[in-house]
From Swiss-Prot:
The gene coding this protein: rplP
Pfam short name (any one): Ribosomal_L16
Keywords from the UniProt entry: Ribonucleoprotein, Ribosomal protein, RNA-binding, rRNA-binding, tRNA-binding
Stated name of the protein: Large ribosomal subunit protein uL16
Disulfide bond positions: none
Record note on quaternary structure: Part of the 50S ribosomal subunit.
GO biological process, one term: translation
Amino acid sequence: MMQPKKTKFRKAHKGRIHGVASSGATLSFGQFGLKAMAPERITARQIEAARRALTRHMKRVGRVWIRVFPDVPVSKKPAEVRMGSGKGSPELWVVRVKPGRILFEIDGVNDQIAREALTLAAAKLPIKTRFVARIAE
C-alpha cells in the first residue's frame, strides 16, 4: 500500500475538492491514460486494486505509471465510542483528485489491450473516468 514515509502533521482537515486539475491533466509518460471526470477522495487500497487489475490484464508487458499518491491521512474513531475526547487516530491514506487529473498511464501495449486494461482498472475506482490516448504526431 502507498503512504508517505514521513509527514509534517499526523492528522489533516477533511477539506473540500474545488475546481478542475491544472497540473497532472495531460499525458506525460505513456501513450494511454485514465482521466478522472469527477472530484473524489481515492484511497491507497483502491489505487493498489486498480494497479493489480491493470498489470494482470497487460500480462506484465509494457509499463505502468501511477500519477497520483495518497498523501492525506483520514482519521477514524473506533466503533461504539462516545462523541468528544478529540479526533480519532489516522486510519487510511487518500488522495484528493480533481476532475481532469490523469490517474494512470500505460505504454508498450496496443490500443485494444490498453482500453481493456484501463476499463478493468476503472471498475476498481469510486469515480467516473475516461480513457485518453496521445494524439499521433
